[in-house]
Structures are given as C-alpha cells and as structure tokens.
Amino acid sequence: EKLAELGVARFQPVDTARGAWRRAAGRRERWERLAVAALRQSRRAHLMEVADPLPLERAVRELPAGCARWLADAGGQAVGGAPAGGGVPGAGLVGPSGGLEEAERAAALAAGFLPVRLADARLRTETAALAWAAWWALGSA
C-alpha cells in the first residue's frame, strides 16, 4: 500500500533462501486490493503491478536494460540526498529478515546492483522497502 502511494510501478516478490513467498498463499490478492486503495488515496495515474514471486536470480536477470539497480545492504555506501533518477526506471532489492545469502548477494551484484545503506540502523524488510521507495521518489520528483 505505502509503496503504491510513493509511486512504485511494480512490486516483485522474490524467493530467497531465507524468505520464500510461495508460503504466502493469498498475499498477492491482498496486495492487489491494497494497491487499488492506494491508487485512490494518492490520486496517482497508474496502478502498481503486483507480480508473481520469482527466484531472486531470475528476477535480477529479467530487469530491463537501462534500469538503475540498488541493493539495500548494511555494508553499502550511505545514501545521501536524492538519487539521480530523472525518469530512469529504478529497481530496489531488499532482502528478507536475516539478509541475503552470499550467493544471492553475488548474483545481485553481478546483475549490476549497487549496494547502498539506507539507514545507520538495521531495518526490517518492510521498512527498508519504504525507505528505498521514498529515497527513489525524491530523485524522480
């Protein structure tokens, strides 16, 4: 819901070693209803797409060329100010509770994701996703 209010165009759940969306029966339908409610609330012109879960390695490979890629990573460079979005599509990858496995992190880095630290504190998955979306929205405004 909050991601849609911030203008996120697509929510792509990913299956990882520490967090499997396949166990979340019924979640997609709920998220779609929340996206519709957020569209009405925010008066945005486009409905956020809620995609079917994909394995992380496939999800990062299937991003369009030219898409800016950011990995929420406690060891990454601290974000400062707004990103230089300027209308370029962006993808934020937020890991599950406990973080990504090293092989998953390596796959994201190999796919061009840049590690960024969204806060000094360790954030929960939902909070990190909101922090990334708000940060990206600043650069797209």
Question: What are the language-model segments listed below?
Answer:
Residues 1-70:
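RNA substrate-binding interface of SAM-dependent RNA methyltransferases
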Residues 4-5, 76, 107, 129:
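Hydrophobic side chains within alpha-helical segments
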Residues 20-23, 100, 124-125:
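Secondary-structure boundary/capping motif
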Residues 20-21, 88-91, 139:
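A short, structure-level motif marking secondary-structure boundaries and short turns
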Residues 54-60, 76-79, 123-124:
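A short acidic, often aromatic-flanked loop/helix-cap motif at beta-alpha or helix-coil junctions
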Residues 55, 99, 128:
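Residue-level recognition of oxygen-bearing side chains
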Residues 66-109, 113-118:
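Active-site/ligand-binding-proximal alpha/beta "capping" segment
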Residues 102-141:
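Structured adenosyl-cofactor binding patch, chiefly the S-adenosyl-L-methionine
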